[in-house]
Every structure is written in C-alpha cells, then in structure tokens.
Amino acid sequence: MYDHMIFHTKYNRKVFQNNIRKRCEEIMKNILDDLGCECVEINVQPNHVHILVGIPLTITPSHVAMKVKRISSWLLRREFAVLKQQIPKALWAPSCTHQSVGNDLTKVIYYIRNQYKKHGGPK
C-alpha cells in the first residue's frame, strides 16, 4: 500500500533551510527504513514535508505517521538548538494529511517533486 503523507511544522514556521532540510530528509528516510517502509519520494519544503511511502500491510499509515513525526522531532530538535528556540514544545503540527495512492505513482511523484514551483522552496 502506498500513502502520500504531508506534515506541517507547528505554527507553519519556515524552519527547514539548508543543513536542517537535508538532515530532516535523512532522518525521515532512516525512520521509514527502520519501520520496513519504502520511501519512494520525499520533498522537504521550508514549512512542510511531502512523503510518498510504501507501507507493509502489517503496519497502519497512522502508526507510520506518528513514528516519523515523533522520532524526527526529537532528533532534529536535539541536533539543532535553533529549532527549540523557534518552536518550543514540538516540531510538528498535531495533525497530518495522508492519502492512499494506487499503484500508478507517477503523478504523485511528479506532484511531490514539483512542490518548489508551488511554494517557492528548494528543489
């Protein structure tokens, strides 16, 4: 099963720049790998992240979202003190969006890859 997940930062703060952005992507890929999921595509924008993920049928999408948000928040805030200053208690907004995707992933991959055109963020 494939899911398109979107996580927004708390208060929609634009905190993902340069090395924080790259590190967020690395951390999320590692978490998904540890969960046995396939990270098909990821795009970290200044205030949100899009992930296309293949999830085994033994795990629920909400469990994956919860783990990715919880662990990435903890690790990023530990590594980058500036995040604790900008967003005191938690990195992510409490809710997230995730939608099941069929087997034709091309349109979703295109959409995720081209977020910078929509939001003006990095490629």
Q: Which stretches of residues belong to each language-model region?
A:
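Charge-rich, low-complexity N-terminal segments
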Residues: M1-K123
